[in-house]
Each structure stands twice: as structure tokens, then as C-alpha cells.
């Protein structure tokens, strides 16, 4: 309808202008020629009105076309260039708020998570890393025993063989008590007990059923006299050496006990 009304209005205005321009006024109406200026003003006002009407019609047609267009295309034309891409909302979202199930993989989620919040599958690796970061005194005995690898144990064994017998296990003695294992302490106590024992009595367990003593007097035929003499000689020689190493004040007490 607006497209039909527009040419009709134009024809009417042109015809009225031609009639006014070609019209011949009678001589008695010559005094009214001063009113021609008023007619010019009216024509100009009419032309302005027509222009305004045409502009309004054009705007209405544009609005109708935009309404008939699809919604995303219409919005993309009206939006700012930096705010377009409404068809792809993930580009406008924050990286941390995107759909995790479609765009982010499980590995990326583990990388972004905190160490204490990772899944159970990677718990062992994280536990080992945390154990390394802890203070040695706060670790458990099991963790301390697992820290010593097989290569370190072989190195300690070779080192103990190459060292002087009196200087073995020096590394264990200088360690902190919390870092020593209970097996090491038992080995050290056994070694110290062997040092304090008499030379002839070492490596003999009197409680064992196989132990029969140096010689059984009731079984004189089975007893080896040579071995008995050697044991007695070693015993007396060892006692003499220990007597020399003892303090003079301690010898008298031992001699009194022997005399009694």
C-alpha cells in the first residue's frame, strides 16, 4: 500500500503546480499578485512535507525487511563488530566457564586441578611427590625404609666391607635417630654384644639344643683333647690381654672374685 500511495501523491502535486503556473489572472485581480510569494511558501512547505513522508515510508520498509530477516543475521548487523558471533557463544564465554564435557579433555582438567584434588588414578604419583617434599623427621618409618633403594644398600654393604672393622656402620651412628630403622638398631646392638663377649664364647648359643659346651666330661671318649687345649690357651691369652687393658683399680675386684 505505501508504494502505491507515493506515486499518486506525486502526480497530484505536480498537476496542482502546473495549473497554478499556467493560470492567467484577470486585470482586476492584479493587486493580488503580491500573494504569489505566499503560494511559493506553500509549495515549499508541501515539498518538505512530501520529503518527510517519503523518508518515513522508507524507514518503515526497512523495518519490515529487517523483521522478515532471520534473527541472528539481524542482530549481527546491528551489533558492534566486537560483540558479534552470537551463533558461537563459546567464543564470548570466559575460558574457565566453557562446556567442560565437549571442549576440555580429562588431561586438561588434571593439569588445571590442584594436587590435592586430582583423581584417584594419579594419587600414588602425587603421594610420592608430597612425600619427597615433607621434612624427613615427619615421615613414617615405612616411608623411611622405602626411601633407601637397593643400589644404596649395596653401596653401604661394599663400603662396610672396605672400611676398618672398628669404623663400620659409622654412617648409621651419625644419622638422626628418627632416620634409623629398628633393624639397624638391632644389628648394632648385636655387634656391640659380640664385642663385649669373650673371644671363646662368641658365635655360641648356650640356649640352643646343639650346643654341648667346650667338652662334655661324661663323654670323654668323644671329646677332642686337642681342641680343648687350644680353646683353653686362647682363653688364657685373651684374659691376659684384657687384664692389661683394664684399669688397675678394676683388676683387684676381678682377682678377689677369682680367689673366692
Curated annotation (Swiss-Prot):
Any GO molecular function: thyrotropin-releasing hormone activity
Subcellular location per the Swiss-Prot or TrEMBL entry: Secreted
Span of the signal peptide: 1-24
Record-linked InterPro entries: TRH
Gene Ontology biological process: eating behavior; histamine metabolic process; hormone-mediated signaling pathway; negative regulation of glutamate secretion; positive regulation of gamma-aminobutyric acid secretion; positive regulation of insulin secretion
Principal localisation: secreted
Keywords from the UniProt entry: Amidation, Cleavage on pair of basic residues, Hormone, Pyrrolidone carboxylic acid, Repeat, Secreted, Signal
Proline amide found at: 81, 95, 136, 165, 248
Modified residues (Pyrrolidone carboxylic acid): 79, 93, 113, 134, 163, 246
GO CC annotations on file: extracellular region; secretory granule
Compositional bias ranges of the Basic and acidic residues kind: 85-112, 195-207
Entry-linked Pfam families: TRH
Region (Disordered): 72-112, 195-217, 238-260
Source organism superkingdom: Eukaryota
Residues the record lists as Leucine amide modifications: 115
General function of this protein: Functions as a regulator of the biosynthesis of TSH in the anterior pituitary gland and as a neurotransmitter/ neuromodulator in the central and peripheral nervous systems.
Family: Belongs to the TRH family.
Listed name of the protein: Pro-thyrotropin-releasing hormone
Biological source species: Gallus gallus (Chicken)
Gene that specifies this protein: TRH
Amino acid at each position: 500500500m505505501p508504494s502505491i500511495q507515493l506515486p499518486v501523491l506525486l502526480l497530484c502535486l505536480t498537476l496542482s503546480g502546473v495549473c497554478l503556473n499556467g493560470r492567467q489572472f484577470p486585470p482586476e485581480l492584479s493587486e493580488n499578485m503580491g500573494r504569489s510569494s505566499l503560494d511559493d511558501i506553500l509549495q515549499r512547505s508541501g515539498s518538505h512535507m512530501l520529503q518527510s513522508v517519503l523518508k518515513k515510508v522508507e524507514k518503515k520498509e526497512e523495518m519490515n525487511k529487517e523483521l522478515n530477516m532471520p534473527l541472528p543475521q539481524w542482530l549481527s548487523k546491528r551489533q558492534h563488530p566486537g560483540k558479534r558471533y552470537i551463533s558461537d557463544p563459546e567464543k564470548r564465554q570466559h575460558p574457565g566457564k566453557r562446556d567442560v564435557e565437549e571442549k576440555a579433555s580429562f588431561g586438561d582438567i588434571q593439569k588445571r586441578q590442584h594436587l590435592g584434588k586430582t583423581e584417584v588414578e594419579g594419587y600414588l604419583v602425587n603421594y610420592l611427590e608430597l612425600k619427597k617434599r615433607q621434612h624427613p623427621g615427619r615421615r613414617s618409618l615405612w616411608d623411611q625404609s622405602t626411601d633407601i633403594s637397593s643400589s644404596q644398600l649395596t653401596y653401604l654393604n661394599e663400603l662396610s666391607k672396605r672400611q676398618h672393622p672398628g669404623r663400620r656402620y659409622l654412617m648409621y651412628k651419625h644419622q638422626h635417630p628418627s632416620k634409623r630403622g629398628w633393624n639397624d638398631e638391632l644389628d648394632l646392638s648385636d655387634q656391640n654384644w659380640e664385642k663385649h663377649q669373650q673371644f671363646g664364647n662368641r658365635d655360641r648359643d648356650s640356649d640352643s639344643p646343639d650346643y654341648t659346651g667346650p667338652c662334655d666330661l661324661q663323654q670323654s671318649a668323644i671329646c677332642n683333647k686337642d681342641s680343648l687345649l687350644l680353646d683353653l690357651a686362647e682363653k688364657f691369652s685373651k684374659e691376659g690381654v684384657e687384664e692389661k687393658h683394664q684399669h688397675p683399680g678394676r683388676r683387684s675386684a676381678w682377682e678377689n672374685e677369682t680367689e673366692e
